Amino acid sequence: LDLRGPKFGCGLGQCGACMVIVKGQATRSCVTTVASVAGSEITTLEGLGTVEKPHPIQQAFIDEQAMQCGFCVPGQILTAVALLRKTPKASREQIVEAMNGNICRCCN
């Protein structure tokens, strides 16, 4: 498939590096069976934007230099996209709660 967005991090569904969007929800792919998502639309980082025209959240990460090694960034971006699609005017508390499951190995 040549998809490089989802990463294999912990393999336990704890770090968020493997995040994809399934049915509008941020979903940890490392603990999700293929059978449970068969026939579902699945969005990876590659499905959001392009190098020439990044998704607004991708652009915000670029503008704010919100990355170091980049390993965790796809999961963080997909988590943010799923949250803001569901709750466009999310409160700070909702954002913190949603992003809490994404661990950055460089900074934590």
Tell me the role of every PLM-derived stretch:
Residues 1-108:
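Signature of N-terminal electron-transfer/Fe-S-associated modules in redox systems
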